[in-house]
Amino acid sequence: MIKLNKLLISAFVLSASLLTGCSNENTITVCASELPHAKILNEAIKPILKEKGYNLKVTVLDWTIQNSAVANDEYDANYFQHVPYLNTNNFEGDKELIAAAKVHYEKLCLYASDKDENKKLDNGETIEIVNDESNIERALLLLSSYNILEINSSCYKKDGSFTFDTSNPNSCVTFLSGYKNCSLTCILESNLCVSLNDYNFGVIPGNTALTGLGDDYASRIVLSEKTTEETISERANIIAVKKSNKDSEKTKALVEACKDERVATYVSNTFGDSVLYHYEDLLTA
């Protein structure tokens, strides 16, 4: 009987937590990465939604489980990824997610470790890059744009899509003159900042650098991603929701709040050139 009561209590607590989350019509629940996402939500978007009669509840969650959390109705939306990542980490059927709005763009940069005080990439040095396919191509394109390496044709399938062997990254690139003996190592994104000092340099996504390198992140930047309006739009971080919730009032309110010029001002004043405000309403696109 005691065991049964415990089970019933657990079920009630779970049901109650769900009801206070996605089911509360005046509360919008969003899971997000800590920086800059949760900070933008709490400090810029939350006050705007409050004016519209909504309470925004933000939970910092590991990025690897945010899509499944929204797909399983634990949250109304998430905010951590760009469209290319969502395209390779989505669900099918009634759990499918869609991009509701683009909000900001984070520059991908090459950061120097403590090993490299002159902050200049030279021949024979080691470079760590992220190991998820949607960001590997981006890291290689950054290095290619500064004539550090060429991406071999073997990295692209016949249909033009990118493919990469994370266990043997150097087989997919050719380092150019002056960098011939450099080498790449693929590292789990959550470990990039921790392991940076094991290498000379690291190509690290913006939110990971902001969180993991702290106030020191800007002083470590060696090279920044060269951007165009097209690349910014393609890699802008999004609000993602379940496809079945596309037309919900909560989704519409959240997307509309992201458009407010106060969000743009906040992002610019808080993060400078590291994070660029870029809004696109994808619900009406």
Question: What are the roles of these predicted feature ranges?
Answer:
Residues 34-57, 65:
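Short, polar/charged alpha-helical segment
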Residues 107-118, 234-253:
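A bilobed periplasmic-binding-protein/Venus flytrap-type ligand-binding module shared by bacterial periplasmic
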Residues 25-35, 54-59, 126-127:
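Short, well-ordered beta-strand elements
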Residues 88-100, 113-116, 198, 212-227:
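Ligand-binding "clamshell"
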Residues 100-150, 264:
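A conserved helix-loop-strand patch within extracytoplasmic ligand-binding domains
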Residues 18-21:
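C-terminal motif of bacterial Sec signal peptides marking the signal peptidase cleavage site
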Residues 135-146, 256-279:
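Periplasmic-binding protein-like
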